[in-house]
Amino acid sequence: MILVYAEIINSRIDYVFRLIFNQVLKSDIEFTDRSTKFQQSDLPKINYSYEKFENEFYIKPHRLLHCQALIQPDIQPVWYEGEKHFFESSNDSDLPFDPFAASFYLVSRYEEYLDVEREKYKRFPAGQSILSKYGLLKKPVVNIWANVLAKKLQEKYPKLKFPAKKFDFRSTIDIDNAWAVAHKGVFRTGGALLKALFKSDVY
């Protein structure tokens, strides 16, 4: 169990903390907005507020998670341990970036709600995304940030353990088209085959 302190526990903070700890790191958290309870607790703890207390794990929050209105943050990458991170934090924070604001920005697709140029069908082009801008489209950045956070927490609280991740391989076969062929009939199937031959679209 990890105790999280925030001055205001709003829906954004609740969502992104549970995403990172419950879904990605498979760990339990508890929130409190009572500073006395937080400081007296013996649990591993995260102070996500604008005031650092003592020697707890501290991250000064970016204002993104506290704003009710949409804002257009100026996002510059923060280099840390060979990776790019977003939303720079303070010098007295245990991480140089805010993994919670950064993760919320991405998983909520926040940038798609801003006044940005769209393609002809009014869709948000991936090439305009912050991940594309910094060459991160193919990286699981939220998982990377969560792992960085977990590592730093374990340095502060050596007894804190996170469950080992389990992976499995599930092979699937898309048979939609094969099923469709079974019901097209001889003439339609033959015509499609001839068309494919003329186009050299046969494998």
Model-derived regions: residue spans:
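Terminal accessory/targeting
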Residues: 1-203
